[in-house]
């Protein structure tokens, strides 16, 4: 008899015999009154006689369950009480006899470094049983058992749908897991085993298998669960959470009649995903996007980085604007009061100079072009004679030729002399003297 079988059939010795209920008996307590108190049993020397007395009561029940196990030495109970640490037992809420939930609290103390972790899941319908993580146990048949997934409280955990008649021994095949690689097992967190309804091996299933509901993932998939509340011991949230196997079905697992899978098949290894990697990348496409809305929304906002600030405007060069304006032609309507610009003095002077030049050009075009032929002939003229010439001017400024004798010279009112042909041609287009720029017509009026 193994220690966990003894722990399953263990009852308090102080209860009367008429109030004790054997393992195989159905529970007659109403469903709304069923609740398992968070009591943890301590293993000691004073409890061992009671364990042996209750062992004979459940011998027939456990003999059928563990008939296919290999014999384990009797000193196995000593190995389960190593280091002076007592295994802890948790009780689940009472379920109907045909479908019960088993909650297991893993041992807190483990060896440092890489140790082989293997634990046994047995077919019991009682309140609870202890599980240790230091005893290697033979492997189970993977085809006889459906795949298990892990769902810890607040993190990833083990969620196992197992028909009770089909479970003989479910162990992990000596998985070497280090302390850092599996923190939920070492931090004494809880995982829940939900067995599915029992199906006889030679009877057809009660109803055809149906796909899992849309809000739950199918079997053989690992589902990351996002914690919504801080983690706390299971005893504190027992009044708020009702863990029932019939409220959390994950699908129907059945076998065809008169068909048994092979006996020895390697078990499917379980995978553990740390909490920090669940929200970064998933090992499978997410078919249920509503399960992680808050984290995905947070990543979406984190990926949107703020836009860079716009580039600053180009600097203002005060000397460029007047130069550009001076290159443009000034229209006639632009003549008027000067536009006051807050510029340098040199720029203002240059702008005024350009404006004056433009104004002079416009005024010059507006005045009369030249003298008439009658006005030109009224100017005095004479023949040049070198002997009686009294003026110091001996050169015509228009043609740059010296005066010769017997040439006709014309004298302007400013007393400047020119060749008659040269100055007449100039006066037809201009009204001023070519040397002093004096007005020839005004001087002519004064002489008259």
UniProtKB/Swiss-Prot annotation:
Task: Please give the positions of the paired cysteines in each disulfide bond.
Answer: none
Q: Which InterPro entries match?
A: Znf_RING (IPR001841), Znf_RING/FYVE/PHD (IPR013083)
What's a GO biological-process term for it? protein ubiquitination
Q: Which Pfam families does UniProt cross-reference here?
A: zf-RING_2 (PF13639)
The cross-references to PROSITE patterns, in alphabetical order and at most eight, read: ZF_RING_2 (PS50089)
Q: SUPFAM superfamilies of this UniProt entry?
A: RING/U-box
From the UniProt record, which GO molecular function terms apply? ubiquitin protein ligase activity; zinc ion binding
Q: Report the CDD domains cross-referenced here.
A: RING-H2_RNF44
Q: Which UniProt keywords apply?
A: Metal-binding, Zinc, Zinc-finger
Zn-finger (RING-type) intervals are: 396-437
Name of the protein this chain belongs to: RING finger protein 44
Q: What organism does the record attribute this protein to?
A: Danio rerio
Which gene carries the instructions for this protein?
Answer: rnf44
């Amino acid at each position: 008899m193994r220690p966990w079988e003894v722990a399953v059939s263990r009852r308090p010795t102080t209860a009367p015999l008429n109030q004790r209920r054997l393992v195989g008996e159905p529970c007659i307590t109403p469903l709304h009154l069923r609740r398992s108190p968070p009591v943890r049993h301590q293993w000691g020397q004073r409890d061992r006689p009671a364990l042996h007395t209750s062992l004979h009561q459940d011998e027939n029940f456990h003999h059928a369950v563990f008939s296919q196990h290999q014999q384990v030495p009797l000193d196995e109970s000593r190995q389960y009480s190593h280091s002076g640490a007592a295994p802890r037992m948790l009780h689940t809420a009472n379920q109907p006899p045909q479908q019960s939930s088993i909650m297991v609290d893993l041992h807190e103390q483990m060896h440092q470094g890489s140790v082989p972790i293997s634990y046994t899941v047995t077919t019991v319908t009682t309140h609870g049983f202890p599980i240790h993580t230091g005893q290697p146990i033979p492997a189970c048949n993977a085809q006889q058992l459906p795949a298990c997934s892990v769902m810890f409280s607040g993190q990833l955990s083990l969620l196992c749908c197992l028909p009770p008649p089909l479970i003989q021994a479910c162990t992990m095949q000596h998985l070497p897991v280090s302390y850092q690689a599996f923190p939920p097992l070492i931090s004494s967190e809880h995982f829940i085993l939900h067995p599915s309804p029992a199906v006889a091996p030679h009877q057809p299933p009660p109803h055809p298998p149906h796909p899992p509901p849309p809000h739950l993932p199918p079997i053989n998939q690992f589902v990351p669960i996002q914690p919504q509340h801080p983690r706390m011991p299971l005893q504190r949230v027992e009044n708020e959470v009702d863990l029932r196997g019939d409220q959390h079905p994950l699908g129907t697992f059945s076998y065809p009649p008169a068909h048994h899978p092979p006996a020895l098949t390697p078990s499917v290894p379980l995978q553990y995903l740390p909490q920090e990697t669940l929200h970064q990348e998933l090992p499978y496409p997410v078919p249920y996007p509503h399960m992680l809305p808050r984290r995905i929304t947070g990543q979406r906002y984190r990926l949107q980085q703020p836009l860079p600030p716009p580039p600053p405007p180009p600097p203002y060069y005060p000397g460029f604007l007047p130069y550009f304006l001076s290159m443009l032609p000034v229209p006639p309507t632009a003549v008027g009061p000067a536009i006051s610009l807050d510029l340098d003095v040199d720029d203002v002077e240059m702008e005024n100079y350009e404006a004056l030049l433009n104004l002079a050009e416009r005024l010059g075009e507006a005045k009369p072009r030249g003298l008439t032929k009658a006005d030109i002939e009224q100017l005095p003229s004479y023949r040049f004679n070198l002997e009686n010439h009294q003026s110091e001017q001996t050169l015509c400024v228009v043609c740059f030729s010296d005066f010769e004798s017997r040439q006709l010279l014309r004298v302007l009112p400013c007393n400047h002399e020119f060749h008659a042909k040269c100055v007449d041609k100039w006066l037809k287009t201009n009204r001023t003297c070519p040397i002093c720029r004096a007005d020839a017509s005004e001087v002519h009026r004064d002489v008259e």
